Amino acid sequence: MNNMTSISKQNGGVHIAPPTQYPNPAHCSILPGMDTLNPQQRHKNMSCIRSKDTSLEKAIRKALHKEGFRYRICDKRYPGKPDIILPHYYAVIFINGCFWHAHEGCRYFVFPKSNQSFWQKKFQRNKARDAENLKYYQEQCWRVCIVWECAIRGKNKNQKIERTKDRIIQWLDEEWDPYLEIKGD
């Protein structure tokens, strides 16, 4: 038994006395920022994360549809399976999660503390794939819009969705820039 707790049997049960001193964080098995789940629990959590039809995608699609825009979604015929495809405008929209696409400088992207070599490779592959997709669409003279999660997430979500929708519509109707990136504040 360490000096942190004392155990005594009282009335046939177990009584755990409060610690006489608080633990030193350097000696804790769980430090802030470390994974507290076992591999099976982590696998279950990660497998429940959706890769399409996320709430952000649905919100942007709903806002565009309400304005009369018609589109395709996650069509496998298009490289990278863009979240929204607007063939009439030769435009594709990717709605990127800040964590999964390693959005540098974003408050929603925090590099994981556990299994760092895996995550380093994963983020490098994701970024390389994103760059390949962007290059492909630019070579095919399609326009590409990247909407980052941080542009919509947080307080005043409905206002942020409206602002993002308005910016996309302006880009589609009035501008012919080949690339648009919408980031959070």
What is each stretch, according to the model?
Residues 1-10:
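Extreme N-terminal basic, low-complexity initiation segments
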Residues 12, 16-17:
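Short hydrophobic alpha-helical segments enriched in small aliphatic residues
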Residues 23-25:
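Short hydrophobic targeting helices and cationic amphipathic motifs
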Residues 27-146, 151-185:
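Nucleic-acid endo/exonuclease domains
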